[in-house]
Every structure is written in C-alpha cells, then in structure tokens.
A protein has these predicted regions:
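Interfacial/gating helices of multi-pass transporter permease domains
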Residues: 5-26, 54, 94-98, 155
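Helix-loop interface residues and adjacent transmembrane-helix termini in multi-pass membrane transporters
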Residues: 9-12, 122-124, 150-152
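Interfacial segments at transmembrane-helix termini and the short loops linking adjacent helices
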Residues: 12-13, 60, 77-108, 152, ...
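Interfacial transmembrane-helix starts/ends
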Residues: 19, 51-80, 97-100
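Helix-loop junctions and terminal segments of transmembrane helices
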Residues: 21, 25, 29-63, 117-122
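Residue-level recognition of pore/gate-forming positions within transmembrane alpha-helices
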Residues: 23-26, 61, 74, 83, ...
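Membrane-interface junctions at transmembrane-helix termini in multi-pass inner-membrane proteins
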Residues: 104-135, 177-181
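Membrane-interface helix-loop junctions in multi-pass transport and translocation proteins
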Residues: 127, 134-181
Length: 181
C-alpha cells in the first residue's frame, strides 16, 4: 500500500529507493526471524504445561538477544550505508541510503515486539490480536496518503507512519498478550 502511495506522489525513483531499503531489511531480518522462530517450540511447550513464568522469561531473554543480534548486523550497515549500496548497486537511487537506515532502525523497534507475538500465538487466542493489528497496519497507507498531501517530503512522513505503527504495535502486543493468558 505504501509503495502505491509513494509512486502516486513521488514517482518511481523514490519507490525504487524504498524498495532497496526493503530488500536490505529482508536480508537482515530473515536471519533474525530464523533465530526467533527457533524459540517458538519452547514457548508453545511452556504454554502447554502452563509454565507462564518460564515463558515470559524466555520472551524477555529472547527479545534481548534478538535485538542485540539485529543491532550487531544492522549497525555496520547503518553507519556505512552509502558504501554498502555502492558495492551492491554501483549507482544506488537517490534516497536509498536514507530509506535503508530508517527501515533498519524501524526493524530494531519491531524486533522488540516479535517474541510477544509468538507468546500470543502459543496461546491460540489470536482473534483479538489479528483484528487489532490488521486494523492498525491497514491504516498505514491511508495515513501515508494524508501525510503526503500535507508534507511533500517522501522520507519524512514515511518515517512517522512506520515508527508510529511500530510504537503502537509495541504497546499493543503486551496488552494483547495479557488478554490471551
């Protein structure tokens, strides 16, 4: 949805720059998601035997490890984005480095709320979670459209919309996790 809105307001060059950022995010987050996914069987086991304290400890420790692992992977890319993109693409699109940095920073925020999601999934009570989070993420393209009408800078509002959604997700996931148990 955001790509369509970006293309509407700023054209294909900005859309390509965001696409490069999303590609870098996919490469880095794939590794982190595998790390987090490896904890899922243990979370389900703790939930099944009603050991909620051990489950919460695993969520907290796993979140810390995942965050610092992503930080270890993302920090060099954030610092040397221009160099990495030049190695990869020779001539990266304008704003690609900015989008890469911002998307990787947003990924760090998102990592903090991923394992609580697996805790909710372990409970099997996902109806409320899916309704709330889907409603939240459906709002991003709508907010982006309104924001780009007011603010004519492609990066500025994209950052605000993405970060607002992740901060809301970060706040809502623990609440939804409490509702699931």
């Amino acid at each position: 949805g955001v790509n369509i809105v970006l293309n509407l307001f700023f054209g294909t060059a900005v859309n390509a720059a965001r696409g490069v950022g999303v590609s870098v995010f996919s490469a880095v987050s794939g590794f982190i998601n595998n790390f987090i996914f490896a904890m899922n069987p243990q979370l389900v086991k703790y939930y099944a035997v009603q050991n909620y304290e051990a489950m919460q400890q695993l969520i907290v420790k796993g979140t810390k490890y995942a965050f610092f692992l992503l930080l270890l992977l993302a920090l060099p890319i954030v610092i040397e984005t221009d160099f990495v993109l030049t190695l990869w693409l020779k001539t990266p699109p304008p704003l690609a480095a900015t989008f890469c940095r911002l998307i990787l920073i947003a990924a760090l925020v998102e990592t903090l709320s991923t394992l609580p999601l697996y805790g909710i999934l372990a409970s099997g009570r996902i109806k409320r979670y899916v309704l709330v989070m889907s409603s939240l993420f459906i709002c991003i393209p709508l907010l982006s459209y309104v924001g780009y009408k007011w603010c004519n800078k492609p990066v500025t509002f994209c950052v605000y919309a993405e970060m607002a959604s992740y901060v809301l997700a970060l706040g809502l996931r623990p609440w939804l996790a409490r509702c699931a148990f």
